[in-house]
């Protein structure tokens, strides 16, 4: 079992790192499964995802993973021990490794490898316990990790920054430290059959950036590197978009000037928007 998690609330990039690990393990011929509690899903108990599973049934992050890796087992269960037991009973093929999403503080599970993520812009050594800060437990909890990854590093990070952060984190010899950064992919229409024309940014677009993630700042910076005209419409992490939210998105989109307008959202948010019954044609053409 491999646990990927953090000790701070908010986004550190668990899902992209989980997807990266899936690819690494698959390349080694390992039959991998993922298990999470399925945060904000509208169901309970153990569910093994299928191609027909909805985002409401399993949650946005498991839905995203199952969509990108249809051949692996993706399960949700608020009882991690029970979920692991169920996955390990599966055959043809049997599960060789289980990736546990956000289970770093689940003390009933003893993972063979614990990977702890910490945001470059808010290192755990600079943080404080809730409610003064964002830590769920004291920073010394990092000592349970065999691997620590500093995520969301800027492209221009310098060697001296590596040295400074290494000293400040003050890890033990048994712990390995890595640094990672996001590499954003190309823009993709949420509804290809309805998209109008090109979907590239050339610098003259008016963009409405819709996010429902914990830390949108790096994404905002990325989008602004393509076009300066970016309006941010920010919702809470894992936000369950309602009819009023869609009306607000359309209203903000209509406030953009000119004909070269675009709505950009994240891959995770797209899972919650795509099958929404109240998503109208205007939004479908422009997201």
Language model regions located:
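Short, high-confidence coil segments that cap the C-terminus of an alpha-helix
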Residues: 30, 92-95, 111, 204, ...
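C-terminal accessory "lid"/substrate-recognition subdomains
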Residues: 123-259
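Generic C-terminus detector
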Residues: 256-262, 268-287
């Amino acid at each position: 079992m491999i646990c990927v998690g953090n000790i701070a609330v908010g986004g550190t990039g668990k899902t992209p790192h989980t997807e990266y690990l899936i690819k690494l393990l698959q390349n080694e011929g390992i039959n991998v499964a993922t298990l999470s509690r399925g945060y904000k899903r509208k169901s309970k108990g153990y569910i093994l995802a299928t191609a027909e599973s909805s985002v409401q049934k399993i949650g946005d992050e498991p839905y995203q993973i199952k969509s990108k890796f249809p051949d692996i087992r993706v399960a949700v269960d608020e009882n991690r021990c029970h979920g692991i037991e169920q996955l390990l009973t599966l055959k043809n093929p049997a599960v060789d490794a289980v990736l546990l999403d956000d289970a770093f503080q689940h003390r009933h599970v003893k993972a063979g490898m614990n990977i702890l993520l910490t945001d470059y812009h808010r290192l755990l050594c600079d943080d404080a316990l809730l409610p003064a800060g964002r830590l769920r437990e004291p920073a010394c909890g990092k000592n349970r990790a065999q691997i620590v990854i500093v995520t969301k590093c800027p492209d221009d990070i310098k060697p001296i920054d590596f040295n400074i952060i290494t000293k400040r984190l003050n890890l033990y010899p048994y712990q390995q430290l890595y640094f990672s950064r996001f590499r954003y992919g190309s823009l993709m229409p949420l509804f290809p059959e309805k998209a109008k024309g090109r979907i590239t940014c050339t610098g003259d677009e008016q963009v409405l950036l819709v996010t429902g993630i914990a830390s949108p700042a790096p994404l905002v910076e990325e989008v602004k590197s393509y076009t300066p005209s970016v309006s941010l419409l920010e919702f809470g992490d894992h936000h369950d978009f309602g009819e009023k939210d869609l009306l607000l998105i359309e209203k903000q989109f209509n406030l953009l000037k000119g004909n070269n307008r675009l709505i950009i959202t994240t891959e995770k948010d797209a899972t919650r928007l795509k099958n929404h019954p109240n998503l109208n044609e205007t939004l479908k053409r422009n997201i």
